[in-house]
């Protein structure tokens, strides 16, 4: 289905939980965030109904997010259900990777095709700092398990933060030379309580590109790996993988936006940076069927703004983990 601005909306990001086994500084504060009671989180069968309804409106791609999606019990069963829905041809997962070693094979068998793993640094001390206690070796084990399970492509999401990891961009890009990894540099976005923390830490993608090219040679435009999305991709000479840039702040890509977001509590959000949501949980629990939910999804599509307004400030009191990454 097309929205008001003739964009084809075919992608639904689903936050299956607001809980996480890490506490990354740009995603949630160290303390004070109230987790949703289990009764307020959409049940697996409710998520399945939403996906069936979304497929009726033209959604073809699903991404499961969190929080950390792998802390949600029954995730593999949800994937099996969703993968069998007519019209859904792609299921992906965004994760910190720590729980992947024991789950990657089962997720692949259930129907997950590919994964994005959050990895902001190659230094163990910095990883522990940015995640507030995470284990870098565990993340790497998860990345390797994804490769071994055949979850291709494996994309690494790296948020660039001035004063923290901008000195690692060359090393991160070098990961793509000998391995089939796709490193995506993401501009820091001011969201939730991290807005004040992010002040002064923003690094434009152009600066990262210049730093990589100066050390490793030209970045040649490359075909996009499977999955689409907003990143622009490049390849270093003879590299096995690609380097991507997501320019949410410096060069927005709203004219190409094809997505909706479903929060863990059942709110359908037309735009990450727009506070409007359509509640799907209440109708679901009042007995609404697939076609009724599809009608609400079409309402959400009609609400999609022409572009985000990040520079005007965050319009929601919730954290990124509560909305869905």
Curated annotation (Swiss-Prot):
Q: What is its EC number?
A: 4.1.99.22
Chain residues that bind [4Fe-4S] cluster 2: 254, 257, 271
Which species? Pelotomaculum thermopropionicum (strain DSM 13744 / JCM 10971 / SI)
Q: Which cofactor does it need?
A: [4Fe-4S] cluster
Give the UniProt keywords, A-Z: 4Fe-4S, GTP-binding, Iron, Iron-sulfur, Lyase, Metal-binding, Molybdenum cofactor biosynthesis, Nucleotide-binding, S-adenosyl-L-methionine
Residues bound to GTP are 13, 63, 94, 155, 259-261
Q: Which residues form a coiled coil?
A: none
Q: Which gene encodes it?
A: moaA
Q: Does the keyword Iron apply?
A: yes
Q: How does it assemble?
A: Monomer and homodimer.
Does the keyword field hold Transcription? no
Organism classification: Bacteria, Bacillati, Bacillota, Clostridia, Eubacteriales
The name under which this protein is listed is GTP 3',8-cyclase
Q: How is the cofactor bound?
A: Binds 2 [4Fe-4S] clusters. Binds 1 [4Fe-4S] cluster coordinated with 3 cysteines and an exchangeable S-adenosyl-L-methionine and 1 [4Fe-4S] cluster coordinated with 3 cysteines and the GTP-derived substrate.
The residues that hold S-adenosyl-L-methionine are 26, 67, 118, 189
Kindly list the positions annotated as binding [4Fe-4S] cluster 1: 20, 24, 27
């Amino acid at each position: 289905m097309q929205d008001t601005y003739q964009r084809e909306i075919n992608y639904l990001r689903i936050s299956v939980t607001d809980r996480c086994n890490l506490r990354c500084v740009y995603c949630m504060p160290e303390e004070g965030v109230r987790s949703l009671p289990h009764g307020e989180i959409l049940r697996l069968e409710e998520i399945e109904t939403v996906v069936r309804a979304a497929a009726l409106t033209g959604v073809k791609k699903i991404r499961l997010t969190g929080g950390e999606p792998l802390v949600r019990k029954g995730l593999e069963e949800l994937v099996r259900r969703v993968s069998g829905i007519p019209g859904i041809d792609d299921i992906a997962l965004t994760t910190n990777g720590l729980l992947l070693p024991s789950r990657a094979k089962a997720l692949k068998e259930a129907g997950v095709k590919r994964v994005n793993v959050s990895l902001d640094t190659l230094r163990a001390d910095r990883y522990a700092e940015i995640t507030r206690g995470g284990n870098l070796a565990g993340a790497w084990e998860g990345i390797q398990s994804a490769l071994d399970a055949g979850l291709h492509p494996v994309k690494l999401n790296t948020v660039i933060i001035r004063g923290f990891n901008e000195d690692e961009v060359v090393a991160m890009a070098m990961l793509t030379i000998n391995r089939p990894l796709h490193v995506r540099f993401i501009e820091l976005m001011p969201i939730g309580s991290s807005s004040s923390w992010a002040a002064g830490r923003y690094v434009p993608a152009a600066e990262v590109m210049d730093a990589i090219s100066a050390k490793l040679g030209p970045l040649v435009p490359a075909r996009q790996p499977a999955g689409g999305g907003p990143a622009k991709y490049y390849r270093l000479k003879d590299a096995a993988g690609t380097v991507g840039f997501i320019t949410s702040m410096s060069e927005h890509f709203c004219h190409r936006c094809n997505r909706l977001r479903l929060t863990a509590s059942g709110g359908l959000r037309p735009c990450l940076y727009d506070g409007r949501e359509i509640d799907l949980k209440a109708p679901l629990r009042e007995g609404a069927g697939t076609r009724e939910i599809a009608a609400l999804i079409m309402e959400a599509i009609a609400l999609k703004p022409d572009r985000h307004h990040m520079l005007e400030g965050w319009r929601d009191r919730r954290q990124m983990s509560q909305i869905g990454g």
